[in-house]
């Protein structure tokens, strides 16, 4: 079982450089087995061109390393907080992809300017606040997760599977590692489109609510009809 989990997480991680979402080692994917509570995550600081399935690190939700010769990603504590708080997710991605990270560094959420955005994410993609000095000094990675969880406590984390951390970068999630990667790719494209839209028309307004609703709910609503349902 753990070998299969490692293989899936390896394959998901290898999608990041394929889609241009990472430079050097600037990113990670994890996936959790909810039955055991174990998750696999990319090891810290290992180049993607040297990565192998057996290099994936198995962790539990208490932060204990169950299996692996390497240290886990430095963002592991953030992943743990999200898995503990968001029971309907099975995979998480963190990158420093340039367009999404540019929005994060600007401290801005990404407005929904069109249907590409609305097809996948309901509403503005949020940018959460900076951590305080105390939060950074106490437990930076854990408190990054705590901050994200706190932001989403009265929001639908399934309808909005992405967040920007101010001055840091994006996190996305999904039902498994591959879906979280898919959402990271979508986020990067949407971030690029939004930035270009504002360059072309600095006075642009968000897409009409009825259009955003139509595109999101035709794909994700109770009566969804986008794609094949069988």
Locations of regions flagged by a protein language model:
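Glycine-rich flexible loops
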Residues: 1-230
